[in-house]
Amino acid sequence: MSINVYEMVTNRIIEQLENNIVPWEKPWQGTIDGAFNRVSKKPCSILNQMLLKYDGEYASFKQWKDLGGHIRKGEHSEIIVFWKMYPIKENQDDGTEIIKTIPLLKYINVFHISQVDGVEPLKQKVTHDIEPIDKAEKILNDYWNRENITIEHVKGDKAFYSPMFDKIQLPLFEQFKSSEEYYSTATHESIHSTMKVTRCNRQEDRKGKVVSFGSEEYSKEELVAEIGSAQLMNIVGIETTKSFRNSTAYIQSWLKVLRNDNKFIVSASSKAEKAVNYILGNQ
């Protein structure tokens, strides 16, 4: 029986949401590394960060063995996913044959450093060269100025991005309970702003579809914005704050989307990662 990797991933996210755990809102641990591969030192993708239980070092059974470690008896693995390119033959109209490559989602089992004997953990980077709030302010201001996005602060309770006017409206800074809450909201709306055709072009996905609160398309874009915002907050070192966007109503709307489309969490995390890189200027 073949294993549906999309189903495995989606079921893991659904399980967390059903237990009121929002997987992209990891508790702040004082390190911006998140989960990463012990051998390559590369951070895990946004999707894999959501799938894994812990921050810190992960590696496959073989990688830990090559490092001189061994997995303790009774320990259970977790999964991470990756794309693998496969060649396929395709016949052309003129009878010729070409080789194309298609991406397939695969998974491997990994273990956390806490499950391993014989390998010392690496030292974690805990300090920040720049204050998190200052870093968040610089990243957003650089992005807004680079893209000529209009920013309006209006006394009230509405925060939104207007694609028509390429404008982000936010409540006044002093209306927020904390600086962290302000920047959480500002990054959320900034992720929305990357939907523009000349940026990450998620507007193309919405053509001819109903986009209103509670609709599937609305929930999909909200999921992209939430995942992307949480990732940006983690990058600058600000604890992701609980918000109305993680209320029961929102969680239920996300569950509905994920149950209807077992490929969407993979797509949403990929779109969020693309949006984050665009804002950071890494595209």
Language model regions located:
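N-terminal accessory/interface modules of nucleic-acid-binding and processing proteins
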Residues: 1-283
